[in-house]
Amino acid sequence: DRNPADGLRMTVSAGANVGERLMAVGERHYGNIRSTATEWLGRVEIASDRIDDQPRAFSGGMRQRLQIARNLVTAPRLVFMDEPTGGLDVSVQARLLDLLRGLVSDLGLSVVIVTHDLAVARLLSHRIMVMKDGHIVEQGLTDRVLDDPQAPYTQLLVSSILQV
């Protein structure tokens, strides 16, 4: 099972987790680091008064959002997400997906998402690639592939979701 703490330093503050990424790309001014970290905590819906709290005091959903801030603060051109909602309660997943969708749109990010959850793929992806045993079985625009799957394996995936 996924652990949202992966990639976070649990013994330093939320602000430091974000700030470390800025320092890694050359930012040295403490005031700038702290204000940018505060801004990014807000963007991922973590209250600014939690900036000095350690991630171990956060819920799984908050840790996941902190990880998002940490990874996006340096404005990468490409982001890789491996099961971004894995290990989270369904109620938390919907909010996280909504947040991710907004950030991807606002920042104009290119994102590669690995997921077994077709709802996640539908919400976050313009294009989809369905793989089985390491081989591509179907690819194309997400809505087309999921609404009218051509490959038998894709048809099976889509129909198994509909029967749940």
Where are these regions (language model features)?
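Conserved ABC ATPase "signature" region
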Residues: 32-49, 158-159
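C-terminal boundary and immediately downstream tail of ABC-type ATPase nucleotide-binding domains
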Residues: 45-46, 146-164
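Conserved ABC ATPase signature
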Residues: 54-58, 62
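Conserved catalytic motifs of ABC-family nucleotide-binding domains
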Residues: 75
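A short, surface-exposed alpha-helical micro-motif characterized by mixed small hydrophobic
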Residues: 121-123
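ABC ATPase "signature
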Residues: 139-140
